[in-house]
């Protein structure tokens, strides 16, 4: 079970990691304009959330941690990558409304909602961008959350000659 504190600390940790790798992410920035600022803009955007999350009490809910993150990121968004990041968290936050804690299924749904909102908000979504990274991450999370396929058939396949 994911508590508000766990989500809060995870987002803070992610913000710190992005800040530490800002220059590397800047180097990856080649589309739509190779201006080398994606890491900087994303770092500033999630950095705004980090600042507010540090002031959030440890007994916060996942709803509150997600809402504070989404709101701070929207207000602190810098550049296209910052705006898209804030949209991802906006959808993520909406999916966690009313939740004190979250399980894996809740987080998968939140990721999916974030991706859906970000794709809808971009006029011409282009694959090979941060949208793709978010979508694939969401799909992989869903795959890990799905029940494993059964090793036994409940009915014999028509191709089986047993």
Regions found by a protein language model. Name each.
Residues 1-162:
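N-terminal loops that bind phosphate or other acidic moieties
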């Amino acid at each position: 079970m994911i508590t508000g504190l766990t989500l809060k600390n995870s987002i803070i940790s992610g913000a710190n990691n992005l800040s530490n790798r800002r220059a590397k992410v800047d180097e990856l920035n080649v589309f739509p304009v190779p201006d080398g600022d994606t890491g900087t803009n994303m770092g500033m955007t999630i950095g705004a959330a980090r600042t507010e999350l540090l002031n959030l009490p440890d007994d916060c809910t996942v709803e509150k941690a997600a809402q504070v993150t989404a709101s701070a990121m929207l207000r602190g968004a810098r550049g296209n990558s910052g705006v898209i990041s804030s949209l991802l968290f906006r959808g993520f936050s909406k999916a966690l409304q009313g939740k004190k804690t979250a399980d894996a299924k809740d987080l998968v749904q939140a990721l999916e909602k974030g991706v859906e909102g970000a794709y809808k908000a971009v006029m011409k979504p282009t694959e090979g961008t941060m949208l793709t990274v978010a979508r694939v991450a969401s799909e992989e999370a869903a795959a890990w959350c799905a029940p494993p396929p059964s090793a036994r058939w409940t009915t014999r396949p028509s191709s089986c000659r047993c």
